[in-house]
Amino acid sequence: MKKLYEEASVQDIADAIREKTGGAETYRIAQMGAAVRSIPDGDQIAHADIPDYVKDGVLTLAQKVQAVKTASSIVFVTVADAHHATDESTGWKANIDTGNMDACRAIKALSHVIPLDFAAFLGDLTFGYKTTTAAQFEAQCREFHHWIEEGLRGIPQLWTPGNHDTGEYFAAETGSLTNLYGAALIRKYFSDYNAGAVYGSAEAGYCYRDLPGKKLRIINLNTVEGEITGGETAADALSEAQLLWFAQTLADLGSKADSAAWGFVILGHYPLDWGSARAGGKVLKAYLDGGSVTIGGKTVSFAGKNGAV
């Protein structure tokens, strides 16, 4: 009998349902209609449910920001190291879930009282333990995105993964790099949330956003690029392609006619003075010194192209 549907399309519908519910259920075709109808209307985070200590903290922070904010100020929020656990059994799972929900509540409340120029997630979204499977990784990503998205609606975002988002510890425990979560899942739950940015690589997610009104370039690096394919023993944090893109992105910014009026922010999970991420730090130092770098046989000179700081 001829099929009246494409299996990939059915899988896409199931994925969409799970993204909306934050769950990890599987569905037969006959169950999908009921599953869609059961998705609750409105927001999951109600202001009435936000604890007083969160509201008080947000109000105090908002007052401090307002006291120093000027027309040229850049206001943003960063989140990192949620280590979301979902169904993983840990001694501190309850604290993780409570803390992450309250953090998402705080971001939603803050976004209602302070206009945010952008938001960034700097990695280690997932629990990423040696027993964390790819299915658990996906469930953790879906639930956390479901919680945080209400506070970030309409705000330019930049997401980058951390070492606990690669599956490298599960791969090491099982003795097989085939158990890494893979580039496709990293793209789905991190890189794709950078939509609207100027990508160096849509798959790896490194990109930049310009805020012309504030004369700011936000450069988003993937400092675990090597670990996504090579695991915890990967020699390089950033590929040559990413390092070259980083150098060219800095040179492009420094070449602007009004570059001295511009600034930049660099995002990533690892700082650029740590481990093999230092290769990125060398690019940055060469830029600040007005020197040059040669990467993969290509030389980028920053002479006269380093006005932006």
Model-identified regions with their sequence ranges:
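Surface-exposed receptor/substrate recognition regions of extracellular proteins
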Residues: 1-64
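N-terminal active-site segment of His-dependent metallophosphoesterases
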Residues: 51-53, 57-136
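Beta-strand-turn-beta hairpins that frame and shape the catalytic cleft
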Residues: 65-77, 204-220, 262
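Active-site-proximal beta-strand elements of phosphoester/diester hydrolases
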Residues: 73-87, 215-229, 267
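Active-site glycine-centered loops adjacent to acidic/histidine catalytic or metal-binding residues
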Residues: 81, 123-124, 162-163, 269, ...
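Surface-exposed intrinsically disordered loops and tails
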Residues: 86-98, 129, 136, 173-200, ...
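His/acidic metal-ligating clusters that form di-metal
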Residues: 105-118, 150-156, 215-220, 231-309
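Extended active-site neighborhood of metal-dependent phosphoesterases/phosphodiesterases
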Residues: 131-245
